[in-house]
Amino acid sequence: GTYTLPSLATVFHALYSAGGVNQVGTLRDVVLYRNGKAFKHVDVYGYIMNGDNTFDIVLQDGDLINVGTYEKIVTILGKVKRPMRYELKGDETLSKALEYAGGFTGDAYKKNLNVTRKGDSEYEMYTVYNEEFPEFVMANGDSVLVDAILPRYENRVSVEGAVFRPGKYAISASIATLKDLLDVVEGPREDAFLNRAILYREREDLTR
């Protein structure tokens, strides 16, 4: 529609006055026409994500703003700081999508991600390793789920029973043997049965 705006109104003011972009509209390539010609291509993400207002151009009388349709919409869910749908354009990659999502949270599993893609007749799954994130080009409709790291430890031991300082300890250079561990827990108490101690070791399948 046609809008009357203040003298210093910008492209963003005009979009706001128009009620924003609808579900199929693009935020990545809003075109400002001036004197019948394309004057500037505006990427709203530059302002939203980075505070870059170089594209927030002051409008002139008779300017036309054209909002086309989006090129790609992808969904980033799980352990990222801003899980939601994002619009991508051109050859933007998984790394760029994760950047828009604010990056990983502290408990995110980062070694690889599974990307679900809509094929012609069924879904396809891609396992993308972290060194491939900058090269993996996203497609329209892609969905990424960032899982959490496993709630278990790779270097923890637990000491229970008749010792002075039972608890959980980290396996390290200073605690590498059972004797080291007994030194840290300050040895057995006076009421401890010294003829036997039981060592449980948890396997990768969580059995003992």
Q: Which ranges hold each PLM region?
A:
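Ser/Thr/Pro/Gly-biased, low-complexity, turn-/loop-rich segments
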Residues: 1-208
